[in-house]
């Protein structure tokens, strides 16, 4: 982790089984007379998913602090925040085949193999593939095939049940003097790499197959970047369901500074100022005022696409011990269920309020009538639904025993309103709460 040298004796004591020679053969250490130095970064990594807790050891290249200088362009990144975000988002359903596009150190491929029978992992970097294969061997994970190449070229003509990608989406000026780090720079202008992924993924998905990735998108002038992403999805030759969530935005200067520091160039130096100028010139020339970051879930539609959701969730999420992927999977199933039901069929369901939902009421002192009712979700995306008296009452009465129709009928009498009008008012909210996981469908007896 620290990149510090150690004596041969200390290294032998720390590696009683592998030994220094074994570590050298694996490319983990370098020996210079009486001292050894690490050739790579080796860290423990632990996580919890739907299959339970697990621990791995992950090898990557030494970071800036250990090297003492800026990163080389062929640097292979270890497990960072983006890696853990994507692995947490990963659907955890059984799959026959999975693809990890842009595998880097191989962390997503290792996660995918826990649920897929066979995984293909690709990267443009031979060094990355070498370390990814080492990580698979180091952790006793088989069933992963490693291939060299860009984007979907290494899997031409193949289709997968699940595609995951933490692609090199960082927006980088295409000018001399700006490092093109393989782990983050896809070699395209602006956010074209994310657009290219969306355009190409459909033909590599089995019907009903899902692709998940992280990405950036640019705000040009005063246009909405999510509208641009929607246009990419609509332009896919293969019909796609889409769920895109923007998690954050950063202005042009802040974005540039973030990624210049990420490469190990320090603020206050001439090199930093030169790179910052290149980034800002590029953004100004192309009219970019800010950059969004978020999650994309794309599914090859089995017919006409029914899911088109583009939203912003910039705050904190709910508690998800086994990862947000569990909630995403449940949301997809709930979406498909309600999309196939007309209002009469939906009304016949007996729903139950999820166990992590709480109700919050705001009242003026001395008043019995709430001025606001909020239904808060503890897990999933941690959503808050603003409810009126009718929706709050329906939610509270949803115990899995009474149908939606029965609850609406009783509420109409209690509130002295027209039952049909109340149903028309409540059912769209019921559909949304079902998809978002505030309401669930228990087994229907």
Each model region followed by its residue ranges:
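Conserved Class I SAM-dependent methyltransferase catalytic core
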Residues: 124-125, 190-245
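SAM-dependent Rossmann-like transferase core, predominantly class I methyltransferases
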Residues: 33-98, 103-111
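Conserved SAM/SAH cofactor-binding pocket of Class I
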Residues: 80-165, 171
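Long, charge-rich, low-complexity alpha-helical segments
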Residues: 1-41, 88, 99, 104, ...
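Flexible, glycine-/basic-rich loop-and-beta segments that form/coincide
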Residues: 252-331
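Mobile active-site "lid"/loop adjacent to the S-adenosyl-L-methionine
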Residues: 126-127, 165-196
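Acidic, low-complexity/disordered tracts enriched in E/D and polar residues
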Residues: 1, 41-43, 66, 303-396, ...
